[in-house]
Amino acid sequence: MSNINLTTLDISEHPNLPTSSAVLFKAKADKRLSFEKIASHIGRNEVATAAIFYGQAKASAEDIDKLAEVLGINYGQLEFLLSGFPDRGKSVPFPPKDPLIYRLYEIVQNYGYAYKAVMNEKFGDGIMSAISFSTKVEKETDKDGNDWAVVTWRGKWLPYSRF
């Protein structure tokens, strides 16, 4: 048996996720595919691909076609499940209970004002877009063999307008 880390889903633990999540995660588990492999097949970033699975990102017609192919799901069924618009932001309780998701929340809670201050000094009065946005997760191993998570956020700077 291969030693693969595979994210699966217990839908009973996530009652706010769309129906498509259960279908996508079941096919992912059945095929033993990582988000990296699925993302490579559909031509998207791993995080963007996972966001489709959690109902937090809109799948294009091309995404649906390629997902149906790689996951072995009927195209018509998948098109029906994924053709609507995402209902973003309601999939996780607030504050988050999952330890990893809570750590991400905690980073913003602890460093949010510091991020804001530095960004304001670099860019002026405004905000970083979470719509014109990309993100990626990488793994780094230091000289001592310790693994480090490298999370990159890249958002368009939107200056406040004067009126």
UniProtKB/Swiss-Prot annotation:
The keyword Glycoprotein does not apply. Gene3D superfamilies: Cyanate lyase, C-terminal domain, lambda repressor-like DNA-binding domains. GO terms for biological process: cyanate metabolic process. Its EC number is 4.2.1.104. It holds the Pfam family Cyanate_lyase. One of its GO terms (molecular function) is cyanate hydratase activity. SUPFAM superfamilies: Cyanase C-terminal domain, lambda repressor-like DNA-binding domains. InterPro entries: Cro/C1-type_HTH (IPR001387), Cyanase (IPR008076), Cyanate_lyase_C (IPR003712), Cyanate_lyase_C_sf (IPR036581), Lambda_DNA-bd_dom_sf (IPR010982). SMART domains: Cyanate_lyase. Keywords: Lyase. Catalyzes the reaction of cyanate with bicarbonate to produce ammonia and carbon dioxide. HAMAP family: Cyanate_hydrat. This is Cyanate hydratase.
